[in-house]
Every structure is written in structure tokens, then in C-alpha cells.
Amino acid sequence: VEIQWRKSSFSEQSGNCLELAVVGGDVLVRESDDPGVVIRTTPEKLRAFLAGARDGEFDDFA
């Protein structure tokens, strides 16, 4: 099964960006400049992470 990776249409072709794929109900996340490292999560956990990022929960990491 070939994985269909997607990235934002706002990303530049040469830019480093996140790519997402859906496989068997899970979400895969990787960086385009390091495609060998893949994070597997669930849609629910990804939504919770994105909401936390939007709400500033991780601002102290940057």
C-alpha cells in the first residue's frame, strides 16, 4: 500500500513543512526534509494537540 502524503497548499515546494497521511484510521505526520521519521497518532489526539498549540499550551517550549 502506497502512502499518500499531503501538505498545505500554502507550503513552498522547497520549504520544510509537515506532511500528513491517513492509514487505517490513524494519522501519520512527518517533516518533508526528514521523511524517515514518522509519528503515528489518532485523529482525536492530533485534534487535541492542535487545539493546545492554538491555545498557547506549548509556548514555553519555543
Q: How should these model regions be labeled?
A:
Residues 1-62:
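Positively charged, low-complexity terminal tracts
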